């Protein structure tokens, strides 16, 4: 939810369906702060993107997937695809463009996509230091 009458140029009650994550806040705030504000070079690079295009009703141009791990859930969101695993169970795949409520698991129909997304998730988990918690099921 965002409220900024002077900076958000969309119709009243506009809802953006663009996925975003906490990692997008710093790039967004830095862009809003304007020129002269730069991210410190001694810190790790930012994975997020600025959300400001959504303030004008535009789509985001996200190149990297979004990764989450919380409360025993492992999640990768890549465009319309969402790969989900709960507490070491089998991975589930959903097409959010067609199934926003995640009722139709498509993992059996798209095994190659599932394998590719699991590899991406495991690579991310190892990179950030949670590699020992990665799933063996479905890989």
Question: What are these language model-derived features?
Answer:
Residues 1-3:
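Short glycine- and hydrophobic/aromatic-rich loop-to-beta-strand nucleating segment
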